[in-house]
UniProtKB/Swiss-Prot annotation:
Gene3D superfamilies: 3.30.70.270, Ribonuclease H-like superfamily/Ribonuclease H. This is an African green monkey isolate. SUPFAM superfamilies: Ribonuclease H-like. Keywords: Aspartyl protease, DNA integration, DNA recombination, Endonuclease, Eukaryotic host gene expression shutoff by virus, Eukaryotic host translation shutoff by virus, Host gene expression shutoff by virus, Host-virus interaction, Hydrolase, Multifunctional enzyme, Nuclease, Nucleotidyltransferase, Protease, RNA-directed DNA polymerase, Transferase. During replicative cycle of retroviruses, the reverse-transcribed viral DNA is integrated into the host chromosome by the viral integrase enzyme. RNase H activity is associated with the reverse transcriptase. InterPro entries: Rev_trsase/Diguanyl_cyclase, RNaseH-like_sf, RNaseH_domain, RNaseH_sf. This is Pol polyprotein. GO terms for molecular function: aspartic-type endopeptidase activity; RNA stem-loop binding; RNA-directed DNA polymerase activity; RNA-DNA hybrid ribonuclease activity. It comes from Simian immunodeficiency virus agm.vervet (isolate AGM266). It comes from the Viruses. Belongs to the retroviral Pol polyprotein family.
Amino acid sequence: AGLLAGSWIPDWTFVSVPPLVTLWYTLTKEPIPGEDVYYVDGACNRNSREGKAGYITQQGKQRVEKLENTTNQQAELTAIKMALEDSGPRVNIVTDSQYA
């Protein structure tokens, strides 16, 4: 795994890459120089509606929270909210969520 060509976002191996995902990865080609990068994710179990949201930074700072009565979309947004709460006023956020 390296960086996507012409991008600062880590290269991921996909089984299938719809055009929307390809377009999504080109929203920002360059990070804000000198600012932290937060990698965020959230998900839940469709049946129990229990989930988790969290982030990890390049420096290894991390936070994970257990969620109840949530959806995948709410969990993804919660992870972004957590990163915004714990970061400085300027931050780079990387998410795999097309919804967020």
